[in-house]
């Protein structure tokens, strides 16, 4: 019996009184266990992901302490309206269901974080604008053709994912009200009908080596992200030579940021820069037809500047508590990543996920910017909108500079680098 099935058995036996967290993932549930209501006064986090649920009970608001609910990878076709009446609920995750309808009353004004990635949502209700405290909104991989006009009222919104939807026009995906939001800092919109042709042109126009799969020998798995696996490898070109590289093989599935094909187009278009993790070539002839890239192997002396946001921090990276920088180190990291961002903008790209956890640094404070999963091509024929998008990226740079300043022994060292 798995740990979660043991938890379910204990729940049904009444042995979890006072529990605050309940993990019932992959328990084969097709109905909401009514015994959960026995924890109504204490339960703050409930995870029902990976089951066969289609509905939640109408009396869900009886869970008066519930703040976080995950129901990803179930069979929901409608976002349950009862969510909107839960008195403390502020984080809702329903990724990878079959949700086509979001009722107006399903969105609580208390929402801080809403995840609806990889569903079938064609429209969001105007009540979205009442979510004045909403900071993070994940809508990639749906069927949206427009955003509600009220999106401009989401004054706390910092991160939004709109990639891989059905937006035919850029003004429907990126309305002026959205781009004018004062705190919007991380934005992704690749893989929509209005920009897929631009992505294809970029792939076709960018000169890049085609590296045969049989020239590569995979080594150890270095890491796994939402879009793929990264391996160490040896590259032995047919003309001779042997050198270490990294190989990224894309999974080919929807991620929280968008489609792997969009990420690959952005990686290639990013070209070469001293502070950007570069691409050596595109893999050809993979036996299963997988798409992949060959990249330079990053020396082990490089490490992530920070960890990704937590459930509590929402949109802010989590740094090691003891991490400190000299003024020179902080300045070098900020200057290098600023230059990397300016390079991407010059290449016609918005990074969209400019975060410390996507930056590698070594002991000499040399920084490398990576992870193009949320990158999008700038609309070169729409200068005002393009400039607005660059400003959003630069707002993320300001956040990074603030975070470095907080951990720097000479905070004034970074003043000149602020956008």
Predicted segments, located by residue:
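The feature captures the LRR N-terminal capping module
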Residues: 1-58, 67-81, 85-115, 172, ...
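Conserved short submotifs of the Hanks-type protein kinase catalytic core
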Residues: 288-302
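Activation segment signature within eukaryotic-like protein kinase domains
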Residues: 333-334
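Catalytic-loop of the protein kinase fold
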Residues: 341, 345-361
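C-lobe/activation-segment region of protein kinase-like
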Residues: 368, 372-418
């Amino acid at each position: 019996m798995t740990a979660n099935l043991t938890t379910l058995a204990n729940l049904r036996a009444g042995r979890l009184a006072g529990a605050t967290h309940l993990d019932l993932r992959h328990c084969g549930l097709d109905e909401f266990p009514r015994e959960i209501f026995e924890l109504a006064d204490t339960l703050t986090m409930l995870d029902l992901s990976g089951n066969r649920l289609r509905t939640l009970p109408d009396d869900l608001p009886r869970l008066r302490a519930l703040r976080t609910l995950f129901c990803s990878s179930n069979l929901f076709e409608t976002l349950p309206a009862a969510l909107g009446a839960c008195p403390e609920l502020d984080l809702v995750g329903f990724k990878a269901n079959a949700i086509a309808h979001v009722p107006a009353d399903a969105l609580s004004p208390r929402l801080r974080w809403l995840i609806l990635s990889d569903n079938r949502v064609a429209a969001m209700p105007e009540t979205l604008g009442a979510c004045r405290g909403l900071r993070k909104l994940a809508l990639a991989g749906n069927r949206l053709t427009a955003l509600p006009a009220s999106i401009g009222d989401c004054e706390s919104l910092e991160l939004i994912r709109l990639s891989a939807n059905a937006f035919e026009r850029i003004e429907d995906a990126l309305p002026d009200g959205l781009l004018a939001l004062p705190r919007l800092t991380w934005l992704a919109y690749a893989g929509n009908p209005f920009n897929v042709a631009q992505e294809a042109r970029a792939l076709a126009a960018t000169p890049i080596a085609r590296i045969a799969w049989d020239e590569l020998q995979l080594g150890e798995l270095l890491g796994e992200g939402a879009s793929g696996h990264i391996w160490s490898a040896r590259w032995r070109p047919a003309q001779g030579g042997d050198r270490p590289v990294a190989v990224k093989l894309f999974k080919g599935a929807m991620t929280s940021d968008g489609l792997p094909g969009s990420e690959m187009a952005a990686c290639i278009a990013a070209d070469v820069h001293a502070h950007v993790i570069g691409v050596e070539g595109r893999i050809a002839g993979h036996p299963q037809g997988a798409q992949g890239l060959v990249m330079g192997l990053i020396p082990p002396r490089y490490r992530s500047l920070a960890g990704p946001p937590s459930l509590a921090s929402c949109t802010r990276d989590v740094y090691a508590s003891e991490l400190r920088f000299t003024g020179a180190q902080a300045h070098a990291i900020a200057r290098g990543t600023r230059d990397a961002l300016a390079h991407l903008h010059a290449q016609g790209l918005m990074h969209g996920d400019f975060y410390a956890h996507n930056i590698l640094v070594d002991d000499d404070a040399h920084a490398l910017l990576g992870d193009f999963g949320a990158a999008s091509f700038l609309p070169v024929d729409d200068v005002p909108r393009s400039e607005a998008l660059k400003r959003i990226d630069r707002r993320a740079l300001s956040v990074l500079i603030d975070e470095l300043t907080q951990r720097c022994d000479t905070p004034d060292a970074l003043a000149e680098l602020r956008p």
